[in-house]
């Protein structure tokens, strides 16, 4: 696994990102990214971090496939991942429990040939 902090122009931490469950023999990995403060979202930090992580996964580590999962309630993240080139593969129904209610969990992926 690889983990990095996401920082603003002044070096303040705004989030984190990582490649998890890297399986070189299978050429696949999972990606995670979180910028928890709504004030720091939609400022380009996520886009820059995602571009760096996908470049690392596909070019440095020669992965063929990168997967990501997101709670269906997080429509902003779903749209962001689609903008970055991820495609929905499936839905885990009622797989996430938050504030007394269940929500679906959306599985997405991007293949190396689809990146840039």
List PLM regions with ranges.
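Conserved beta-strand-loop-alpha-helix junction that forms the acyl-donor binding cleft
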Residues: 38, 68-78, 95-99
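Conserved acetyl-CoA-binding loop-helix of GNAT-fold acetyltransferases
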Residues: 42-56, 75-83
């Amino acid at each position: 696994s690889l983990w990095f902090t996401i920082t603003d122009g002044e070096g303040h931490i705004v989030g984190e990102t990582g490649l998890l469950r890297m399986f070189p023999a299978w050429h696949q990995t999972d990606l995670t990214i979180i910028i928890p403060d709504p004030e720091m979202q939609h400022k380009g930090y996520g886009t820059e971090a995602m571009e760096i992580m996908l470049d690392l996964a596909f070019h440095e580590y020669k992965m063929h496939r990168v997967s990501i999962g997101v709670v269906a309630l997080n429509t902003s993240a779903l749209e962001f991942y689609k903008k970055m080139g991820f495609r929905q593969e499936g839905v885990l129904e009622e797989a996430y429990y938050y504030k007394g209610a269940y929500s679906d969990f959306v599985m997405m992926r991007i293949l190396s040939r689809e990146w840039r």
